[in-house]
A protein has these predicted regions:
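FAD-site-proximal beta/loop scaffold in flavoenzymes
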Residues: 140-148, 252-301
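FAD-binding core/adjacent interface of flavoenzyme oxidoreductases
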Residues: 3-8, 17-20, 71-158, 236-245, ...
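Local cysteine-cluster metal-coordination motifs and their immediate loop/turn environment
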Residues: 358-372, 385-403
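Beta1-alpha1 glycine-rich phosphate/pyrophosphate-binding loop at the start
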Residues: 20-77, 156, 161-162, 166-202, ...
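A Rossmann-like FAD-binding core segment of flavoenzymes
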Residues: 78-103, 112, 178-264, 274
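Low-complexity, small/polar and acidic-rich linker and loop segments
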Residues: 403, 410-413
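A conserved FAD-binding loop/helix module that cradles the flavin
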Residues: 294-326
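Active-site-proximal substrate-binding core of FAD-dependent oxidoreductases
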Residues: 285, 318-354
Length: 413
């Protein structure tokens, strides 16, 4: 890939409908890899993302962001591809017609028609409710990373990070560079699970090196948040650590309990969902003809898996099956890593018991746990409490309820 050069931003025109051979939704690692794989075919390609620059969450730009070399190379290659148009800070508003979406940015709205579409819509954090989680000073673990990259001042602030998965260590590293004082990294997985995961990392040397670099003396297994304490803002965190309750004074708490695939657009387009992710075949093709998906909207495995899945989808979308097939062994390698990741960091059922009767589950509509516990499902809960009907449209509470109550989220309409 060539050296970094500035990328283009193709804005919308409210007076026209644009036509493309291939439309890619999402400009994270999977979306960029898909565009670059498809570009040599000469197809007219559009890639849209609601962020101001390509890279997704893992390669998010910002005043304090240090983009890795791979991110810079992919950005440069994307900018150099003359048949690829990037629509940054752009969102999908509606499905206007078959093979046609209505898009908008801050200035206008317009339609885009496509022959083939690749969904690279990524994932969002799973946030579970617990007493005090709405206090100022409490954020998601990934949310904290985004704030740090955006320049939020953390110098001297005491920070506790809790939840599950490698993102906790990555968030801690970012916060430490910004001047935060790490007090505890509370991982809910057991020591046995972490040991088994670590023993497998030799199969993926780059991941073993990364884990070694992120290792932190404040990391504890068998630990999870019980409550955030404070009156008007966060003052301390109560943790369960190996069965013992401890309290740690702090100014910030960042929690992340894994990821939830962003499947809403895929579902609205008629793509089948399985195991809470968009279902795909060996070619990354969805159940709907001429629709593909790649990256964490199809399951979680890190940027390496997202990149290879995106490339397979890009090649397959333009008929380059031979090149797509050549990447199958590489995908299998990273899928094996994803399997280990998801197995070893499976959530402890105790986390379902964190919320108390008056703990808010839906923050937008002020719906407490007690108003939901006796409901039979998601639709019943919405009818009786307006849960999930606020500004975030259930992106936070919907995933939490799915985990807490085993509800099935209905297909978006």
């Amino acid at each position: 890939l060539p050296n970094p050069v500035p990328y283009r931003h193709a804005g919308g025109d409210s007076a026209m409908t644009r036509d493309f051979d291939l439309l890619i939704i999402g400009a994270g690692p999977a979306g960029m890899a898909a565009a670059l794989a498809a570009a040599p075919s000469g197809a007219r390609i559009a890639i849209i993302d609601d962020n101001p620059a390509p890279g997704g969450q893992i390669w998010r730009d910002g005043v304090q962001a240090q983009l890795p070399a791979a991110a810079q190379r992919y950005r440069a290659a994307l900018a150099a591809a003359s048949n690829v148009q990037l629509f940054a800070a752009t969102r999908v508003v509606a499905i206007a017609a078959p093979q046609q979406l209505l898009l908008e940015d801050d200035n206008s709205a317009w339609n885009v028609r496509y022959s083939t579409l690749i969904l690279c819509t990524g994932a969002r954090e799973l946030l579970l409710p617990f007493p005090g989680w709405t206090l100022p000073g409490v954020t998601g673990a990934g949310g904290l990373q985004a704030l740090v990259k955006g320049g939020i001042p953390l110098a001297g602030e005491r920070l506790v990070i809790a939840g599950s998965g490698p993102l906790l260590l990555a968030s801690a590293a970012s916060a430490r560079k910004a001047g935060a004082q790490i007090q505890r990294i509370a991982e809910q997985a057991s020591l046995a699970a972490l040991s088994a995961f670590t023993l497998q990392l030799a199969r993926w040397p780059s991941k073993l090196l990364q884990a070694t670099q992120l290792l932190d003396s404040h990391y504890r297994s068998d630990s999870f948040v019980v409550a955030a304490l404070g009156s008007e803002k966060l003052e301390a965190v109560r943790l369960s650590q190996s069965g013992k309750i401890i309290e740690i004074p702090c100014e910030r708490l960042a929690c992340g309990f894994g990821l939830i695939a962003n499947t809403q657009l895929g579902q609205a387009l008629g793509c089948r969902v399985a195991d809470q992710a968009i279902a795909v075949d060996d070619w990354q093709a969805c159940s709907r003809t001429d629709h593909y998906a790649a990256g964490e909207c199809t399951g979680f495995g890190g940027s390496e898996l997202a990149l290879v899945e995106g490339a397979i989808a890009g090649y397959a979308a333009v008929g380059e099956q031979h090149q797509a097939r050549a990447l199958w062994p590489q995908r299998a390698r990273w899928q094996a890593f994803a399997t280990q990741l998801n197995r070893r960091f499976a959530l402890n059922p105790q986390l379902k018991q964190l919320a108390e009767a008056d703990t808010l589950v839906c923050r937008c509509e002020d719906v407490p746990y007690s108003a939901l516990a006796e409901r039979s499902g998601w639709v019943d809960a919405k009818l009786h409490s307006r849960c999930g009907m606020g500004p975030c449209q259930g992106r936070i509470c919907g995933a939490a309820c799915e985990y807490l109550f085993d509800w099935q989220t209905p297909t978006p309409r």
